[in-house]
Regions:
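Cysteine-nucleophile active-site neighborhood
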Residues: 1-63
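Phosphate/oxyanion-binding loops and surfaces in catalytic or ligand/nucleic-acid-binding neighborhoods
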Residues: 46, 50, 69, 141
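Acyltransferase
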Residues: 117-144
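Short amphipathic alpha-helical segments and helix-helix/interface helices
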Residues: 7-11, 75, 135
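Residues that form or flank phosphate/diphosphate-binding pockets in enzymes
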Residues: 35, 94-95, 129-130
């Protein structure tokens, strides 16, 4: 994306954007994956590995609960305790753009927003009604 000039286009375009799982991670400035990778830089922060801990498997594959940090139209109908399905080995620490968190060997951003750029670390397509709600909220928020 950098070589083709698309990163600059994405930074300048005003169209709403929703990144899911790796797509959310790509919204940030940098990832520790593969020894360090520059990402899109649309949101401030770095993607880091989920640290090993007793009883914690990496990659994280399974259902976890969401906890609201701040309200947003994207998370309407997704109260604290809502369960969502995650598959990831890297995660985004809580930032000023975090809307909801999840806990797995630490507390991580589960849903983020900065302007018209949103991200969900979990998989809406696997998260049944919670995933449908998030996608519906996104479409309602960005529809004219």
């Amino acid at each position: 994306l950098h070589d083709s000039g698309l990163v600059d286009v994405l930074r300048q375009v005003g169209q709403p954007l929703l990144g899911v799982c790796l797509g959310m991670q790509l919204l940030f400035e940098r990832s520790a994956e593969d020894g360090g990778t520059e990402c899109l830089g649309l949101l401030a922060g770095e993607v880091v590995p989920i640290p090993p801990a007793p009883g914690v498997r990496v990659p994280h594959m399974g259902w976890n609960t969401l906890t609201t940090v701040r309200e947003d139209p994207l998370t309407t109908g997704l109260p604290d305790g809502t369960r969502a399905y995650f598959v990831h080995s890297f995660a985004v620490p809580v930032t000023a753009d975090t809307l909801q968190t999840t806990e797995y060997s630490g507390v991580w951003s589960a849903v983020v927003r900065h302007g018209n750029r949103w991200g969900a670390q979990f998989h809406p397509e696997r998260s049944t009604s919670a995933g449908s709600r998030l996608l519906t909220n996104f479409l309602l928020e960005v529809s004219p």
